[in-house]
Amino acid sequence: QTTVIKPLVKQPTAFAIITDNQTYANTKDAMHQYKTAVEDDGLATYLISGDWQNPDQVKQIIIKTYQECPSLEGLVLIGDVPVALVRNAQHMTTAFKMNEKAFPWDQSSVPTDRFYDDLNLKFEFIRQDSVNHQHFYYKLTEDSPQRLNPTFYSARIKYPEKKEGDKYAAIASYLKKAAAAKADKHNQLDRVFSFNGASYNSDCLIVWMDDEKAYMENFPLAFGRQMGFKHWNFRMKHPMKYKLFSELQRKDLDLFMFHEHGMPTGQLINDELACTDFNNRYKPQIRN
């Protein structure tokens, strides 16, 4: 069963919150607080929940909503919304390359929400994962466009299962926090911090060259004050985590973004210390 709660107000553009019935039932108050906050931010907001059996069901409701409201510009997937793992598409990943024939499917396939937000791409369903029933394998077809051109922007709010704990309480807490932040009109988003961790995007600095343009477009107020925007790289210090801890404790900081590899309970900040000078290359060994 799918439930669609339509926007309460008319706006030039629209947004969709998509969740599963179980998550909605356990976070209902927080979900509606978040919906109201997004609408107050100027976006007509749909709240869609369903008992999703596969990604195609979710995609069909997205397409239907888009047909009814062509001004739909973005969406967020909250909770246990099925995940599409795509094969035959590694030529469109930034750095991930793994032999699909030599490695297990769950390792060599690419989990991506481009399945939902890029309606130009064509996929062929293969099968459901035998262990994680929320994972579904698809193939990017040969006659599909071979470049990304998303129809919407999208995000996913999902609690990592391996972290254990009450996932619904955590999601509800996050949504209430996000709603409160949107409601605070006096606290402008003018202090932003971005950090790039080790081994991300193949450690290629060229990849990040145009990042500042995107930051200036999305967070213009941060560039109107001294030190309003900081962009750090893991190469700046080893270890970096203690300096990051100091920044995270700043009361005035509005947004902190990590670009790095991670695990459910850990983040990969620094790489092994590079041998860039004499002291790094020659370390006397102390023997007992």
Residue ranges and their predicted role:
Residues 1-288:
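Cysteine-dependent hydrolase recognition
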